[in-house]
Swiss-Prot record:
It comes from the Eukaryota. Mostly expressed in petal limbs and tubes, and, at low levels, in flower buds, stamens, pistils, stems, roots and leaves. The gene is CCOAOMT1. This is Caffeoyl-CoA O-methyltransferase 1. It comes from Petunia hybrida (Petunia). Belongs to the class I-like SAM-binding methyltransferase superfamily. Cation-dependent O-methyltransferase family. CCoAMT subfamily. Substrate binds at K23, D165, N196. It catalyses: (E)-caffeoyl-CoA + S-adenosyl-L-methionine = (E)-feruloyl-CoA + S-adenosyl-L-homocysteine + H(+); (E)-5-hydroxyferuloyl-CoA + S-adenosyl-L-methionine = (E)-sinapoyl-CoA + S-adenosyl-L-homocysteine + H(+). One of its GO terms (cellular component) is cytosol. Binds 1 divalent metal cation per subunit.
Length: 249
């Protein structure tokens, strides 16, 4: 029986890797579930649990930040004592809520997304959690807003943390702007930088269309971040991969 069980698990892993596009990067789904059930879910704030379960019912739920990454962001923001933050790409607001719960009562989040309707799915939960006053939500493309911010020198170096989880084909365009807005010693977080594990997959690997389409943009971003002398970087296999860039100049 043990051999049969091992064969089933091996077959499941093969099936998973035949189509790149799985949210967790861990090879074992059971191990990922262990992390969630042992470390994440027992300590997840009730409001984040409510929003996670609400988002799971939405047809585009794959866009949400994973629960383990939400926990990571929440702790990271506390460690760096972040107060003035920015989020590019909001969806229903799970990572936004993780940020809002981590920063102080007078902290601020400039949040941008092209779809307010998705944001309003999570807004009642955010309001009930008592942190909606920290959020300045802007509907529409982020680049025009960033251009306005960069134009005013008073905004340079004023952000403690900036999280980017939006259109992957604009990640480099975002980086060109937000590098001036984050303070020296501040952090930028780029989500999905391991892109469903597709970055090292053979060219003939079956992939979902969106995974294949954005793959080259993520590869280009990762090379650009590694070559940027203005930041120190650390790529972490949390969620779908997150790269942290600490501005040093």
């Amino acid at each position: 029986m043990a051999e049969n069980g091992a064969a089933v698990q091996e077959n499941q892993n093969v099936i998973r890797h035949q189509e790149v596009g799985h949210k967790s990067l861990l090879q074992s789904d059971a191990l990922y579930q262990y992390i969630l059930e042992t470390s994440v879910y027992p300590r997840e704030p009730e409001s984040m649990k409510e929003l996670r379960e609400l988002t799971a019912k939405h047809p585009w739920n794959l866009m949400t930040t994973s629960a383990d990454e939400g926990q990571f962001l929440n702790m990271l923001l506390k460690l760096i004592n972040a107060k003035n933050t920015m989020e590019i790409g909001v969806y229903t607001g799970y990572s936004l809520l993780a940020t809002a719960l981590a920063i102080p009562h007078d902290g601020k989040i400039l949040a941008m997304d092209i779809n307010r309707e998705n944001y309003e799915i999570g807004l009642p939960v955010i309001e009930k959690a008592g942190v909606a006053h920290k959020i300045d939500f802007r509907e529409g493309p982020a680049l025009p807003v960033l251009d306005q911010l960069v134009e005013d020198k008073n905004n340079h170096g004023t952000y403690d943390f900036i999280f980017v989880d939006a259109d992957k084909d604009n990640y480099i365009n975002y980086h060109k702007r937000i590098i001036d807005l984050v303070k020296v010693g501040g952090l930028i977080g780029y989500d999905n930088t391991l892109w469903n594990g597709s970055l090292v997959a053979p060219a003939d690997t079956p992939m979902r269309k969106y995974v294949r389409y954005y793959r080259d943009f993520i590869l280009e971003l990762n090379k650009a971040l590694a070559a940027d002398p203005r930041i120190e970087i650390c790529m972490l296999p949390v969620g779908d991969g997150i790269t942290l860039g600490r501005r040093i100049s």
